[in-house]
């Protein structure tokens, strides 16, 4: 239900999101609490190799884990990309992958 919502830095839904806010909101709807930042989310569970990623796993990007998306299967993630862009699906390989975490 977040697909197409605008990116707003610091927003955690439901009308707008930043990348980590989207992950926090989505997992929160499933009753799982996540930390607020992508860096903290990268450490909020079990690390798994990309080859074992399942829908719902968090994929963090760049060496500083400054971006995060949610794996949805089929080599795709859903994420809130950047200001001026809406929440969308994109290839899991859109940026250099830092880690895959299963909350």
Task: Please provide the spans of the model-predicted regions.
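Hydrophobic beta-strand signal
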Residues: 58-60
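Catalytic cysteine-centered active-site loop
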Residues: 2-55
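Gly/Ser/Thr-rich beta-alpha loop segments that engage phosphate groups in nucleotides
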Residues: 6, 12-15, 71, 75, ...
């Amino acid at each position: 239900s977040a697909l197409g919502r605008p990116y707003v830095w610091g927003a955690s839904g439901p009308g707008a999101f930043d990348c980590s806010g989207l992950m926090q909101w989505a997992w929160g709807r499933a009753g799982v609490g996540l930390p607020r930042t992508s860096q903290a989310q990268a450490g909020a569970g079990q690390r798994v190799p990309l080859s074992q990623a399942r829908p719902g796993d968090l994929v963090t990007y760049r060496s500083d884990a400054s971006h995060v998306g949610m794996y949805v299967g089929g080599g795709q993630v859903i994420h809130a990309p950047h200001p001026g862009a809406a929440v969308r699906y994109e290839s899991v390989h859109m940026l250099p992958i830092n880690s895959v975490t299963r909350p």
